[in-house]
C-alpha cells in the first residue's frame, strides 16, 4: 500500500518561496452581484509574471481561469453583465482593449491602438461604449523603431524635451506624450479621443448615469507641478466634446470623482489650499452638487485619511483613494488607521456620523460594488497569510465578509509563518509609536539578532499585511521589528505633518527609541542589532549610521542621501518653498540640513547599498554617494547595482530573478555580520 505523504514538518519561508505565491487583484463584481472577475498573478517559468483573469460565483464554488493570455488584466463588466472588457498584450501586440462574453468564448480585440499604455477602463451606463485612458509611446521608443535601429546598427536616439515632467518611475521615459481619454464603440470598435488637455495626464473620470456625459478631475494649468491646487471638475459631453467647468468649487487637489446613481451629486477625494499636492494633510471625502458645484467635506470631523497606503511586497500599496456610492444617500470609502485599512460609510446629508463597517486587524484593498450597492468584493490582507478575495453583504452597520478564494492556503499550511505581536513604544518625548515584532517561528527561548525595518514614503504605513521579505528574515533566525514613526499615515494629520520639511528629526527619535526598545528585549542579542529600509527607509538607514554606532550592520536600499541633488534629479522635482523650505539651487540650507550624506564623516557601520540603474524616483547617484563616502573612509561597504530594466519598485514588482538575487544579498549580508567573523 502507498505510504502517506503527510508530514508535520513545515518548510521555512525562503527567497525562492515567492515563486509559490499567487497574487490577486482588480476584483470586479458583476452588476447583479452574482459573479466575480479578478486578476490572478504568478511568477512564470520564463522569469516573467503570468497574469490571467479568473472567474467565480460570489457565494459558492471554486474559481476557474477565464482568459488564456499571459498578460491580461483590468476586468470590467458590461452594465447588463453579458460581457467582460479587459486589457491584454496577447499575440505580441501592444496593449489593446478586448471584450469577451461573460459566459466564456472567444475574446475580440475592440481596439487597434498604436504602441502605448492603457488605464482606467470603464463601460458607459448604456453598455454601448467603453472609455479608457491611453498614452501613445514616443515614436523613437517603440519596439518597431528599436528593431529597425538594431538591424541598421543605429544608436539609441537622444530624448529631447522642453517639459520637466517627461519620465516616471516604473513607467519610463515618455517625453511630452500624455494620457488622453478615449471612447470606443462596442459594436464596431471605432474609437476616438474625447479629452486630452490634462497637462500631466493624471486625470480621473466617471460616467454620468445618462451615459452622455463624463466628469473629469483634471489640471489644465501650464505649470501643474507648481499649481497642483488648480484641479477642476469638468463635465464632458461625449458626443460633442464640449466641456463645462463645475462652478464654485473649493480650490485644491481633486480626484476619483464618482456620480451618485441619480446623477445629482458627485463624491470625490480632495484637499483644499494652495499646498495640496505631496501633502501631509488628510485626503478628505468631499461632496458637491453636479450643477452648482456647492461642496462640503464629509470627513472633516474625523482625522482619517483616504490614502490607506499600507505597504507590502505581496500586494500593491494603494496610494489612490477608493470611493463608491451605496444608493443615493450613502458613500463608502476606504481609510487607513493604525496599520489597518477599512471601509467606512458616510452619510450624504451629514446627519449621521461616519461609521466603520469592517473590523479586525486586516487591510482591505480597493473594493467593487454590485449595481444596487448591497454587495462588495475586496482583497483581505493579514500578517500571517497573503491576500485572498472576500465577498460581503453591506448593511447599515457592517459588512459581513466571506472568504472566497484559497490560492495561498497550501502555502500557509506547509510553511513556518511567523506571527507578529503588536506593541506601543514610547519615544523620547513620550510619543507612542506602533511597532510590530516577528520572532523566528521555530526557535523559541533563544536570543536572536534583531533587525529594524523602516518603511518608505515616508507618508505611508506598515501594518497588517503579509510581508514575504519579513517572513524570510524571521525564518532565517532574526527578530524583525517594523514600526510607524512620525510622518506615517494612519495616525492623524498632526502625526503625519510632524516631519514636513524636516526629515531626520522626530522621525529619527522614534526609530532610535524602537531600536533601543528592541535591544532591551530578552529574546534579542543585545550587541547584534541591524537596520534596513528602502526609499525613505533607506534615507533613515543612512541617517541612523551617521548618528549612532549602535548598529552592527545596515542595508540602505534605493535610498535618499542628498536632498539637494534629489530635488533636481527625481521624476518629481522639488518645488521651491513648498514641502521643503528654499530650493536646491541657491537656497539649499533646509535641504542640506536634512541630508544624511552630511553625516557620513561619522559613519562606521558596515553597510550594504542596493540600488537600481532604472530608478527614476531616487536616482542611483543617491546610493553612489553613500557607498563612495563609506569606502573612502575605509568603512566596510558593498554596492549592488541592478540593471536599467529595474526600477524603484524592484523589490515588489521587479524581474523575479533580480528579486531573488536581492533577497539573497540581504541574507548574506546579515549572515556575514551577525553570524560570521567581522573586523568590527
Language-model-detected regions and their locations in the chain:
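Active-site-proximal cap/loop segments of hydrolase catalytic domains
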Residues: 482-680
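Predominantly five- to eight-bladed beta-propeller fold
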Residues: 2-7, 51, 135-187, 227-232, ...
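Beta-propeller fold detector
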Residues: 64-67, 108-111, 192-195, 244-247, ...
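Short loop/turn segments that connect beta-strands within beta-propeller blades
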Residues: 57-61, 101-105, 185-189, 237-241, ...
Amino acid at each position: 500500500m502507498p505510504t502517506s505523504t503527510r508530514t508535520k514538518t513545515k518548510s521555512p519561508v525562503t527567497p525562492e518561496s515567492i515563486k509559490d505565491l499567487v497574487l490577486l487583484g482588480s476584483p470586479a463584481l458583476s452588476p447583479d452581484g452574482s459573479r466575480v472577475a479578478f486578476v490572478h498573478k504568478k511568477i512564470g517559468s520564463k522569469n516573467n509574471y503570468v497574469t490571467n483573469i479568473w472567474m467565480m460565483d460570489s457565494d459558492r464554488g471554486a474559481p476557474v481561469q477565464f482568459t488564456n493570455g499571459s498578460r491580461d488584466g483590468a476586468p470590467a463588466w458590461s452594465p447588463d453583465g453579458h460581457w467582460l472588457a479587459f486589457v491584454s498584450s496577447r499575440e505580441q501586440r501592444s496593449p489593446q482593449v478586448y471584450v469577451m462574453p461573460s459566459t466564456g468564448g472567444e475574446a475580440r480585440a475592440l481596439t487597434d491602438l498604436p504602441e502605448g499604455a492603457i488605464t482606467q477602463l470603464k463601460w458607459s451606463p448604456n453598455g454601448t461604449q467603453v472609455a479608457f485612458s491611453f498614452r501613445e509611446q514616443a515614436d523613437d521608443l517603440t519596439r518597431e523603431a528599436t528593431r529597425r535601429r538594431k538591424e541598421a546598427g543605429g544608436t539609441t536616439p537622444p530624448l529631447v524635451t522642453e517639459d520637466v515632467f517627461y519620465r516616471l518611475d516604473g513607467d519610463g521615459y515618455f517625453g511630452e506624450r500624455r494620457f488622453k481619454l478615449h471612447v470606443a464603440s462596442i459594436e464596431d470598435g471605432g474609437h476616438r479621443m474625447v479629452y486630452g488637455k490634462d497637462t500631466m495626464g493624471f486625470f480621473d473620470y466617471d460616467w454620468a448615469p445618462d451615459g452622455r456625459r463624463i466628469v473629469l478631475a483634471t489640471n489644465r494649468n501650464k505649470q501643474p507641478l507648481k499649481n497642483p491646487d488648480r484641479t477642476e471638475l469638468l463635465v464632458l459631453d461625449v458626443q460633442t466634446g464640449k466641456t463645462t467647468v463645475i462652478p464654485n468649487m473649493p480650490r485644491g487637489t481633486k480626484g476619483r470623482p464618482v456620480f451618485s446613481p441619480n446623477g445629482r451629486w458627485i463624491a470625490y477625494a480632495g484637499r483644499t489650499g494652495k499646498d495640496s499636492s505631496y501633502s501631509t494633510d488628510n485626503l478628505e471625502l468631499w461632496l458637491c452638487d453636479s450643477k452648482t458645484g456647492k461642496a462640503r467635506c464629509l470627513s472633516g470631523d474625523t482625522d482619517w485619511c483616504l490614502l490607506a497606503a499600507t505597504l507590502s511586497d505581496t500586494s500593491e500599496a494603494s496610494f489612490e483613494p477608493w470611493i463608491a456610492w451605496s444608493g443615493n444617500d450613502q458613500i463608502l470609502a476606504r481609510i487607513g488607521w493604525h496599520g489597518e485599512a477599512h471601509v467606512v460609510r458616510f452619510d450624504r446629508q451629514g446627519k449621521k456620523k461616519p461609521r466603520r463597517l469592517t473590523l479586525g486587524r486586516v487591510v482591505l484593498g480597493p473594493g467593487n460594488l454590485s449595481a444596487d450597492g448591497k454587495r462588495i468584493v475586496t482583497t483581505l490582507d493579514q500578517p500571517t497569510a497573503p491576500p485572498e478575495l472576500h465577498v460581503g453583504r453591506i448593511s447599515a452597520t457592517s459588512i459581513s465578509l466571506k472568504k472566497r478564494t484559497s490560492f495561498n492556503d497550501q502555502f500557509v499550511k506547509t510553511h513556518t509563518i511567523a506571527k507578529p505581536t503588536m506593541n506601543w513604544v514610547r519615544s523620547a518625548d513620550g510619543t507612542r509609536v506602533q511597532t510590530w515584532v516577528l520572532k523566528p517561528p521555530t526557535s523559541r527561548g533563544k536570543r536572536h539578532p534583531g533587525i529594524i525595518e523602516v518603511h518608505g514614503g515616508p507618508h505611508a504605513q506598515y501594518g497588517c499585511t503579509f510581508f514575504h521579505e519579513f517572513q524570510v528574515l524571521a525564518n532565517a533566525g532574526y527578530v524583525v521589528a517594523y514600526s510607524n514613526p512620525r510622518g506615517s499615515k494612519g495616525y492623524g494629520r498632526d502625526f503625519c505633518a510632524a516631519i514636513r520639511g524636516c526629515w531626520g528629526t522626530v522621525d529619527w527619535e522614534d526609530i532610535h527609541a524602537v531600536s533601543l526598545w528592541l535591544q532591551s528585549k530578552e529574546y534579542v542579542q543585545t550587541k547584534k542589532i541591524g537596520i534596513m529600509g528602502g526609499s525613505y527607509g533607506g534615507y533613515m538607514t543612512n541617517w541612523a549610521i551617521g548618528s549612532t554606532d549602535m548598529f552592527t550592520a545596515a542595508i540602505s536600499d534605493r535610498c535618499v542621501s542628498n536632498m539637494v541633488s534629489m530635488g533636481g534629479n527625481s521624476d518629481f522635482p522639488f518645488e521651491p518653498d513648498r514641502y521643503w523650505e528654499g530650493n536646491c539651487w541657491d537656497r539649499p540650507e533646509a535641504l542640506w540640513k536634512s541630508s544624511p550624506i552630511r553625516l557620513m564623516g561619522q559613519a562606521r557601520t558596515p553597510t550594504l547599498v542596493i540600488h537600481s540603474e532604472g530608478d527614476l524616483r531616487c536616482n542611483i547617484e543617491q546610493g553612489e554617494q553613500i557607498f563612495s563616502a563609506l569606502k573612502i573612509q575605509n568603512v566596510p561597504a558593498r554596492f549592488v547595482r541592478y540593471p536599467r530594466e529595474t526600477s524603484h519598485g524592484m523589490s515588489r514588482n521587479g524581474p523575479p530573478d533580480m528579486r531573488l538575487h536581492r533577497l539573497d544579498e540581504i541574507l548574506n549580508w546579515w549572515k556575514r555580520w551577525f553570524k560570521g567573523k567581522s573586523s568590527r
